[in-house]
Design a protein with these regions (language model features):
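Multi-pass alpha-helical transmembrane bundle typical of ion/small-solute transporters
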Residues: 1-357
Length: 357
């Protein structure tokens, strides 16, 4: 109970608030108990789907967050949720519609409330560009983990050793991604192919820019550390995590239209899920779960590569979000089981690593 209160208390409170808002909105918009119950049910289902399909997001977040100080960890949970809720679940789809329809923000809000079907059509119509941008960014996040010459722990041994080995080639992962994007673009009609490639390149550039900012901030922190000054900055990691969360959210926001085309209902449901993902991240960091299970990170990053690949392919093929989530869950489950098996077979090595940390 203490663990639940400590790590998930804020998320549970946030859930109560969102359900309260859903209750109020349901009664005011439908005027019936049945209509309100339907809205609340959709909110709950959306939140559960968001949580169940985002465990890989939480694991990857934890791998970054564990190196940030406590203050920035808290900011990720508080400030970051504002970006996740208002930025990705509300402003992002509204911005897509505003750009696609050439209308202003207020007109877009009115459209989402008065003509949800047209609002859904406009958001879904932007899927090719979203798939290119989000897929490229996520693919780079996953590839960067494995294209690392200093990586000495391997889960899928032969593949990971090979990727670690060829990382000596400059920008090998970028070349691989560009080739994949070019191949997928050949399957698309010409206008969509151009949109897809431009969006994918922008996703790649965004990843490089965020990595660059993080590196510059780390160098500045190192200078301060050498000078004996206190180092408290976690801005680079904070920016990286929020862009990563945005990339994870693209498919979820669009896929939510399968259950509802009401902007308010979608925002409430996905926001609850986003809050719990952040709480799961903090829980993983505080409990040191990544250190206890040596292959868990590997499973999460493989899941991200798969998610990025599926997102890129979704520009041409419809792939259910359920399938995507199941693949991620299977990879993480296998990596967890492999980690437990390793710990049982090599207890002395595990103890030595724990003492070394």
């Amino acid at each position: 109970m203490d663990t639940l209160k400590r790590f998930y208390g804020l998320s549970l409170l946030f859930t109560v608030v969102c359900l309260g808002l859903g209750l109020w909105y349901g009664m005011s918009s439908t005027g019936t108990v049945a209509g309100t119950a339907k809205i609340l049910w959709i909110i709950v289902v959306l939140s559960v789907l968001e949580i169940s399909l985002s465990f890989d997001n939480a694991v990857v977040n934890a791998s970054v967050l564990k190196d940030m100080d406590r203050a920035w960890q808290k900011r990720f949970l508080t400030w970051g949720i504002l970006f996740a809720v208002f930025g990705m679940r509300i402003v992002f789809p509204l911005a897509i519609v505003a750009i696609a329809a050439g209308i202003g923000p207020l007109e877009t809000v009115n459209l989402s409330l008065r003509d949800p079907a047209e609002y859904e059509r406009l958001v879904s119509g932007a899927h090719v560009g979203i798939a290119g941008f989000g897929g490229a960014f996520l693919a780079m996040v996953g590839l960067k983990f494995f294209f690392d010459s200093d990586k000495d722990v391997h889960w899928i041994d032969s593949i990971e050793r090979f990727l670690s080995g060829i990382s000596a080639l400059p920008a090998a992962e970028i070349a691989l991604l560009l080739l994949a994007m070019w191949g997928i673009s050949l399957l698309l009609p010409e206008p969509d192919a151009l949109t897809f490639l431009i969006a994918g390149i922008l996703g790649l550039v965004t990843f490089i820019a965020v990595e660059g900012v993080s590196t510059l901030l780390e160098l500045q922190e190192e200078k301060q550390r050498l000078a004996g000054a206190a180092v408290r900055s976690g801005l680079g990691g904070f920016l990286y995590l929020n862009i990563l969360d945005a990339s994870f959210s693209f498919d979820g926001v669009i896929g939510a239209f399968a259950l509802s085309n009401n902007m308010i209902v979608i925002a409430l449901g996905l926001s609850i899920g986003a809050m719990f993902v952040r709480s799961m991240t903090i829980h993983l960091v505080e409990k040191g779960t990544l250190a206890q299970y040596r292959y868990l990170e590997h499973g999460a990053f493989w899941a991200i590569i798969v998610l990025g690949g599926i997102m890129l392919l979704s520009a041409r093929f419809h792939i259910s979000e359920t399938i995507t989530g199941l693949i991620g869950a299977v990879l993480i489950g296998l990596s967890l089981w492999w980690s437990v098996r390793f710990n049982r077979r090599h207890p002395r090595m595990v103890d030595a690593e724990a003492q070394g940390d």
